[in-house]
A protein has these predicted regions:
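Nucleic-acid endonuclease domains
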Residues: 1-154
């Protein structure tokens, strides 16, 4: 994946990137379609964010993916896809799982999020959002697809 380098972190600001991704002999279109799935794209984006935002360190810990250097700020990277964005703990998301809203809200209030809009992959929008703001605006721990422009509004 090729991407712009060395960007300072600002909250509630969109960072727009156009990525180039390839894998073996797969067509560019096939790779792009695969990387519109947040479950797959997240693994690459988590690592790339550390490169492009040098203030971040990738840690892949329980409940968060990055820490901000020289601080105690924790971040969880989440993908916005054709089904929207969910910011409850990963252990609460998926078939047969249930969200404990009090626990999810408590957790979200202790960390911040890196929302990555991959709907138009290879175009990706990245936005740093405070967890407290997400809980206040989206208490269901879900940003629906039709709220996409609301989340990424400047």
């Amino acid at each position: 994946i090729i991407w712009r380098l060395d960007v300072d972190i600002e909250y509630n600001k969109n960072y727009d990137f156009t990525l180039q991704a390839s894998f073996g002999d797969l067509t560019k279109e096939t790779v792009q379609e695969v990387l519109k799935d947040g479950r797959l794209a997240s693994h690459f984006l988590e690592r790339q964010l550390e490169v492009d935002f040098p203030e971040l360190t990738f840690v892949n810990a329980k409940g968060y993916d990055h820490i901000r250097k020289n601080s105690d700020i924790l971040y969880d990277q989440k993908c916005f896809t054709k089904t929207g964005l969910r910011f409850a703990l990963s252990s609460m998301i998926g078939t047969g799982r249930k969200i404990d809203y009090s626990e999810a809200h408590a957790h979200a209030k202790t960390i911040d999020y890196i929302a990555c809009d991959i709907v138009d992959f290879p175009k990706v929008r990245v936005r740093f959002v405070r967890g407290t703001d997400l809980v206040e605006k989206y208490p269901s721990c879900r940003v629906k697809f039709n709220q996409r422009e609301d989340l990424f509004a400047n």
